[in-house]
Amino acid sequence: MNALTPLSARLERSDGHALVTLARSRGAVRLRDLAQRGSAKAFLPRVEGDVPEVVFLNTSGGLTGGDRLSYRLELGAGCRATATTQTAERAYAAGAGAARVEVLHEVGRDGWLDWLPQETILFEGAALERETQISLAPGAGCLMVESVVLGRAAMGETLSRLAFRDRRSILRAGKPVLVEPLALDDRALAAAGGAAMLGGARALATLAMVGPGAEDALGPARAALGEAGVEAAASAFDGKLVLRLLAADGWPLRRQVARLLTVLRGRALPRVWQV
């Protein structure tokens, strides 16, 4: 009798990189360069008005252990643009190692970037390390949001295993003006009901505005709060506006975030964000 020896299979990992460069030319903001490979894609849909939109997309359908993903946007001096993601990002159970995501955006002098990725949904056993950095030149500003959902409440999912590290930073002339690290693991999930942790929330978001007019936006931002099921706090200081939000489910959080972004931007969200 011959014994069959199982063959070990090496799972293919996704690896993607997308870079978009915009510059002002002939009185308008235009595409200067577009480079993409692997699972990362970027496109510029037609929009009304003179503020272009850049939409990033991970064609692999989600992230798991060993995956690599990079999004980069470079805005020239005087450029204003909005960047977002095609859909929510999903991080699935990791067999070995963590998925790594790098988001690096640069905003030239007197430019402005709205970085509005859709939410990240973390599934049981996910392992994800993400670094988001926005570098501002003198006179530049940005509005950014990051939303995280712990499982799908509608499916009755409750997470107990997770390895999530997320670091968001905004720099001006190379110096940090806002740094926000977040780490969630098994121990944090076990204590998530405590007031010092998530207070039982399963969805969380941070929204930050840095640049001219940021502190003046505190009043309109607070007036836009009030979505049922969402707890929120807002503060403004040193040229920054920061809001933090918690909810028991991703949908009320998404509605609240969408309302805030619409108020702060003074115009509709990108079409892919339709709520």
UniProtKB/Swiss-Prot annotation:
Q: Which UniProt keywords apply?
A: Chaperone, Cytoplasm, Nickel insertion
A single GO CC term for this protein reads: cytoplasm
One Pfam family recorded for the sequence: UreD
Q: Name one GO molecular function term.
A: nickel cation binding
Localization (cell): Cytoplasm
Q: Is Glycoprotein among this UniProt entry's keywords? A: no
Q: Which InterPro entries match?
A: UreD
Q: Which domain of life is it from?
A: Bacteria
Q: Which HAMAP family match?
A: UreD
Q: How does it assemble?
A: UreD, UreF and UreG form a complex that acts as a GTP-hydrolysis-dependent molecular chaperone, activating the urease apoprotein by helping to assemble the nickel containing metallocenter of UreC. The UreE protein probably delivers the nickel.
Q: State the function annotated in the UniProt record.
A: Required for maturation of urease via the functional incorporation of the urease nickel metallocenter.
Concerning its family, UniProt says: Belongs to the UreD family.
Q: What's this protein's name?
A: Urease accessory protein UreD
Q: Which gene encodes it?
A: ureD
